[in-house]
């Protein structure tokens, strides 16, 4: 083995006979080959870390935006909550409307929009005199209802169609 290192005709012997800068370059080449993988792993890890940091910043900004939307929706929901007093008035009003419509022979369809001041959309189908009697009786018996909109439509070959929008007030008039 000693002869291999001392023999000037072996590859190692030829390398030893080279000038000093070739020895240095060879050493740097071997060193770079050894540390290439850890350096590459570090670079990949660093770039992945920056990607994750950017994703995190985007997710945080999205979360902040969604929290602002949620807060806004909660505030709007709080401002539109139906008070218990108004909620207690809705069921008797529904029964009264159904009873009056049946008594006057009107077909009716009603829909409530809930909020601080609930809105009642009422559609009636029947004759004008019966509709007039229905509205007079309803408004006389329900002082908490105020008419926001009243619209009559008369198709050529059908009964009168009436659309009324009422607003339910908190206090009775």
From Swiss-Prot:
Please identify the protein, giving its name as recorded.
Competence protein C
Q: Which UniProt keywords apply?
A: Competence
Origin species = Haemophilus influenzae (strain ATCC 51907 / DSM 11121 / KW20 / Rd)
What highest taxon heads this organism's lineage?
A: Bacteria
State what this protein does: Involved in transformation (genetic competence for DNA uptake).
Annotated GO biological processes are: establishment of competence for transformation
